[in-house]
Regions:
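Conserved pre-ATP/AMP-binding loop-to-beta segment of ANL
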Residues: 10-11, 23-55, 62, 72-77, ...
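Structural core segment of the AMP-binding/adenylate-forming
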Residues: 1-31, 139-140, 147-148
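Gly/Ser/Thr-rich phosphate-binding loop
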Residues: 115, 141-145, 155-219
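Conserved AMP-binding/adenylation subdomain of ANL enzymes
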Residues: 74-92, 102-142, 157-158
Length: 268
């Protein structure tokens, strides 16, 4: 009530907890869908009109309100889904994520291809430890995304999914932390031997990927296939020197790219 700009709140009935009674200013989503006529208005906005506000982690102070533009995000996500992940119209995309993680925004981007997106509300290990894989089999998911930690959990639990019907599953994407060699081996041995396993890395700052999978390069256990198309990505030391050889460093984009943040919200 204290946020004056909010005019209405749409309520999505959840389980058996909703009794249908709503206060003024609240509307039942099902009743809205049931209306025969819904007034729609479409307005034109600039290409980089604000679309998302994502918050930095807060490790370097107060979280920053990183603002991303609509057209910018549309181009980047369309590229990543269509050219890197081979998602097609009518495919089914499921990334297990909270709404506060940038992977939720990334998941929404699959709609630009004409794909259907699937949301899962609940624990990834309850009521059974293999519930997400069963969900993929039941819903015939084409692209399944999850954290590297989850794959490591499945490996430690020594679970096997060869009896699950995963013929529709073309791609498994992993992010959040590096996907180690042993996790790659587990996926191909215990989940599906002919799936495209893509370790990806990006971030809130770019609401997309810097490096990720592709359809043309070989998949090597413990490695990421390559750079995101059109991005000039390199690795530098903390002192600004280019890393040579098999050494650790910081991912750097050296030239402009679509999903550069347009501003910090209310930055003066």
């Amino acid at each position: 009530k204290k946020i004056k700009s909010i005019k209405e709140v749409i309520v999505f009935p959840y389980g058996n907890k909703f009794d249908g009674k709503l206060s003024s200013g609240f509307k039942d989503f099902n009743l809205i869908l049931g209306k025969s006529k819904i007034d729609k208005s479409f307005k034109k906005f600039p290409f980089n009109h604000p679309l998302y506000i994502l918050y930095s982690s807060g490790t370097t102070g107060v979280p920053k309100c990183i603002t991303h533009g609509a057209g910018n995000v549309l181009i980047e996500h369309n590229k990543e889904f269509s050219l890197h992940c081979n998602v097609k119209s009518n495919d089914k995309v499921f990334y297990y994520t909270t709404t506060g993680w940038m992977m939720w925004n990334w998941l929404v981007g699959a709609l630009s291809i004409g794909a259907s997106i699937y949301l899962y509300d609940g624990s990834p290990t309850y009521p059974t430890k293999d519930i997400l894989i069963k969900f993929c089999a039941k819903e015939k998911i084409n692209l399944f995304g999850v954290s590297a930690k989850y794959i490591d959990f499945l490996k430690k639990e020594k679970l096997n999914f060869k009896n699950q019907k995963l013929s529709n599953l073309n791609t498994i994407a992993s992010t959040g932390s590096p996907l180690v060699k042993e996790s790659f081996e587990f996926v191909y041995k215990n989940i599906k031997k002919d799936v495209h396993l893509a370790s990806i890395s990006g971030g809130t700052d770019v609401v997309g990927c810097l490096v990720l999978g592709n359809l043309f390069s070989k998949v090597y256990a413990g490695e990421i296939q390559g750079e995101s198309l059109g991005l000039d990505v390199d690795i530098y030391t903390e002192n600004g020197k280019k890393v040579s050889g098999n050494k650790k460093g910081e991912l750097v984009i050296k030239k402009p790219f679509p999903t550069m943040p347009i501003k910090f919200w209310n930055d003066k």
